[in-house]
Amino acid sequence: MSLPVRVATLIVAFLAVGALAGFVVVHYFLASSGPPVEDFTAHVTPDTGASVSVVMQEAPQTTVTTDPDWVTYFIQSPQTHKWIHTTNFEVPAGSTVNMTIFGYDGCTPLRNQVWGKVTGTVGDVIYVDGRAVSVLNSWSECSVAHTFAMPNLGINVPVASPTSFQANSNLCSASPCTPSSPHTVVKFSFRTPRTPGTFFWQCKIPCGLGFIDGNGGPMQTIGYMTGNMEVVG
């Protein structure tokens, strides 16, 4: 084979590989929009200190997906009040977020009790079923199911779980969960930055059952136990 023919063959092969890579990117990455983003910015002027209310729940399973044994979060739509399987939400810059998390999952001892300390919220407290607490010690009492942690804003919230044996033996079996199942109600507030940006949040309890060290699966998948808060101006 002559040199020009070999060069032409290599160019054709290179273009074919490039075309294949482009197809994969477009059809398998860009075509997938991922979980929706719930918008809490309507009728709120950014950077005025106004407040928005975000309601979430964590569930011990995800029966609305093809991974029913994965633990997950849901966000309640501010427009329809339906539970949406997503962990992405949008809030105004320079505002106060009043968050409520319904804790339907059972207790899991924290690997490191540092995740049981509340940080980054208004007053560095949360309200568990109406009771103000600054620490949940999962080593002395099985009282924590998951966490809501946003490292870039210094936020760490241990999400309380039902503590009784009876409650932990009768957890919600279909998601999204309903108030008839054992649960806790965790409330707290935090302030958003005045500068727009994307802030990653996740659960710090290794709850990916069946994955190495519990850190795979739902723990690293947007829409389950990790997500993004979009702060918009």
Where are these regions (language model features)?
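Extracytoplasmic entry segments of secretory-pathway proteins
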Residues: 1-140, 150, 233
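Extracellular/periplasmic metallocenter environments
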Residues: 18, 22-31, 123-233
